[in-house]
Amino acid sequence: MAYSQGGGKKKVCYYYDGDIGNYYYGQGHPMKPHRIRMTHNLLLNYGLYRKMEIYRPHKATAEEMTKYHSDEYIKFLRSIRPDNMSEYSKQMQRFNVGEDCPVFDGLFEFCQLSTGGSVAGAVKLNRQQTDMAVNWAGGLHHAKKSEASGFCYVNDIVLAILELLKYHQRVLYIDIDIHHGDGVEEAFYTTDRVMTVSEVSMVNNFPGTGDLRDIGAGKGKYYAVNFPMRDGIDDESYGQIFKPIISKVMEMYQPSAVVLQCGADSLSGDRLGCFNLTVKGHAKCVEVVKTFNLPLLMLGGGGYTIRNVARCWTYETAVALDCEIPNELPYNDYFEYFGPDFKLHISPSNMTNQNTPEYMEKIKQRLFENLRMLPHAPGVQMQAIPEDAVHEDSGDEDGEDPDKRISIRASDKRIACDEEFSDSEDEGEGGRRNVADHKKGAKKARIEEDKKETEDKKADVKEEDKSKDNSGEKTDTKGAKSEQLSNP
């Protein structure tokens, strides 16, 4: 049994596929999967890989996806490509694919990897093989049953929660993205087995849901919790409402597992955001949730100033590991884009915090009133546990030779699309391109990087065949382990 007792260090498993950063939504689109590669490269160079198990996720199958999504919708996602869009014009309109959710090369494979990591993490938690599972490629909370929305196509969160519900009577979903987690709330709006808690920007109108009065319906009444925030909320104000609300939710609902969506568009300076949180303020949410010592699935989400997304998710990985990391960034493949300060942490802006103490207290009291309406810990009639979505002893789904797979390091260096770094084009001169003062240090760091290249290559996530017994053969990579998870 992997669960840690008390407040000790947790066992953490982390899901990453080196191909994830290759997918490209298109020129000018704010969603950039490359941010996940930047995050991975940064946490590798901080040495965090030594402290957790790293797994390459399986590609989720259409069968797995249709446990929530409609057959027609998933069939459409499997079929649509940039070169055959004209044949699917009616379906594109029907399924809301085309503008915010464009068709791009490898769209379905991208969805498979995003979903595969989240579902595999849920399976690990169910099997009590880890305390926390991390999939920064997941957290795509806007996708609906038969519709793409808000840059999201397949709702990996809903699918992961459905997996957790096989073993857990009650699952708590917490969303700290600036945009409302509408797709997840909608999926579980009429059940008491999942409580959804989401902070929402009142001004950033997309997706237009998440009102304080949206509390669930039927059996799910009072099991949806939304707290709308005004522009400019800072670390102090956010902490004053997040901790007491989550503590009250834990007291009343008593979940046995938690899913935390860590959308980073609530950070100060985000291209699409209007909040003023620092990386530390954002990560405080992870710290608060960790204190309850429940199985925890941590997922990505929004975040459109990608260098800050990489900072945030790297730091939150360290928080999950109870690991202190220095503010000075280590040299990495994307070092120049963290200028001009080359630091891990960011400073808040001087924007006005429109969340007055009176407003915050009013919101908090309204939420407490709703939570008091909850019966304590609703019971669930226990049934036979369904089969896990992912089998440990299943074979390689694509039959590829893992030894011939290009390394993540080589892939990182090969992919260099200038468009991926357009998140700061409105910041004027200076900005992150001012690297002159760091050339000497960077040169020295490059030498050190070359010396440890062999060691870092060992941290590249590889597929490997599983031995016939269920224990599986693992490769010694100084703490980084890889596992091939494939179709049931």
Swiss-Prot record:
GO-annotated cellular components = cytoplasm; ESC/E(Z) complex; histone deacetylase complex; nucleus; NuRD complex
- Bias-annotated ranges (Basic and acidic residues): 402-417, 429-481
Q: Where is this region: Disordered?
A: 389-488
Please tell me where 1D-myo-inositol 1,4,5,6-tetrakisphosphate binds in this chain.
28, 32, 271
Q: Mind listing the GO molecular function terms for this protein?
A: DNA-binding transcription factor binding; histone deacetylase activity; histone deacetylase activity, hydrolytic mechanism; histone decrotonylase activity; metal ion binding; protein de-2-hydroxyisobutyrylase activity; protein lysine delactylase activity
Task: Output the SUPFAM superfamilies linked to this UniProt entry.
Answer: Arginase/deacetylase
Instruction: Determine if Zinc is one of this entry's keywords.
Output: yes
Work out whether the entry's keyword set contains Metal-binding.
Answer: yes
Catalysis performed (reactions):
N(6)-acetyl-L-lysyl-[histone] + H2O = L-lysyl-[histone] + acetate; N(6)-acetyl-L-lysyl-[protein] + H2O = L-lysyl-[protein] + acetate; N(6)-(2E)-butenoyl-L-lysyl-[protein] + H2O = (2E)-2-butenoate + L-lysyl-[protein]; N(6)-(2-hydroxyisobutanoyl)-L-lysyl-[protein] + H2O = 2-hydroxy-2-methylpropanoate + L-lysyl-[protein]
Instruction: Report activity regulation.
Output: Inositol tetraphosphate (1D-myo-inositol 1,4,5,6-tetrakisphosphate) may act as an intermolecular glue between HDAC2 and N-Cor repressor complex components.
Q: Where, subcellularly, is it found?
A: Nucleus; Cytoplasm
Q: Which UniProt keywords apply?
A: Chromatin regulator, Cytoplasm, Hydrolase, Metal-binding, Nucleus, Repressor, Transcription, Transcription regulation, Zinc
Q: Which family does it belong to?
A: Belongs to the histone deacetylase family. HD type 1 subfamily.
Functional note: Histone deacetylase that catalyzes the deacetylation of lysine residues on the N-terminal part of the core histones (H2A, H2B, H3 and H4). Histone deacetylation gives a tag for epigenetic repression and plays an important role in transcriptional regulation, cell cycle progression and developmental events. Histone deacetylases act via the formation of large multiprotein complexes. Also deacetylates non-histone proteins.
Descriptive protein name? Histone deacetylase 2
Which organism's genome codes for this protein? Gallus gallus (Chicken)
